[in-house]
Amino acid sequence: MKTIDSIPTSKIQRASKLIQTGAKVGVNYIKYYGDKITKTEEEAKENLNINNASDIYDGLKQMKGSALKVAQMLSMDKSILPRAYVEKFSLAQFSVPPLSPPLVNKTFKNYFGKQPNEIFDTFNATSINAASIGQVHQASKDGKNLAVKIQYPGVAESISSDLAMVKPIAIKMFNIKGKDSDKYFKEVEDKLIEETNYINEVKQSMEMAEACQNIPNLVFPKYYPDWSSEKIITMD
């Protein structure tokens, strides 16, 4: 899978990406009105949904973060979206272009002052899984096999601004109504704030493991605070 060398992180950059995606959707609607002349309404609408789903997903997967997370969560409720959107947006759960190795190395340098191969005995710079807010790499240290989760740049900082931009678009395109939309997007925002707080995740996970250590047959991952930071989590 093709990797990404940069992610739009500023509000202007991310808004520009949404505008570019919106322009493609506008072209798709022009095609749709042309298709209605030569095709049935059902065929024309299906083509519109397929084209829009593809263009919107392509734009969101480059932005990553909360914009892509909204698409992922919408795809879980098949009553909201047409089938073409469900099929495309569900890819956000497991099939997103990962950060390139140089960008991974830069993230480590920013938070540890070292490259990953200076911290671990081995580190696979190619991720084994990439989703909406981060990706996972395999590593090893002192004979232990480790999973290293890296959060995408700018994700936590752009949650509120992303949702403010995406919300009116989603409401209009997918007919999400009134108070339900406010509740839905508040839940998305709260979930994203929680998921991007890596320091708190490590702390809570270690506390839970300690509290449950005497329960038979219950195994928790071991977290390594020395190899974790605001944007990186290392666990076994």
Where are these regions (language model features)?
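N-terminal accessory/targeting segments that precede structured cores
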Residues: 1-135, 142, 146, 158-185
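Short, conserved clusters of charged catalytic residues that mark active-site
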Residues: 51, 55, 203, 218
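Residue-level signature of catalytic and energy-coupling elements of molecular machines
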Residues: 71, 136, 148, 201, ...
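Conserved protein-kinase N-lobe ATP-binding Lys motif
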Residues: 93, 150-156, 188-194
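Flexible glycine-/small-residue-rich
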Residues: 93, 141, 150-152, 225, ...
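Switch/connector loops and helix/strand junctions flanking conserved nucleotide-binding motifs
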Residues: 156-158, 234
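Conserved structural core of kinase catalytic domains
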Residues: 163, 167, 183-213, 219-236
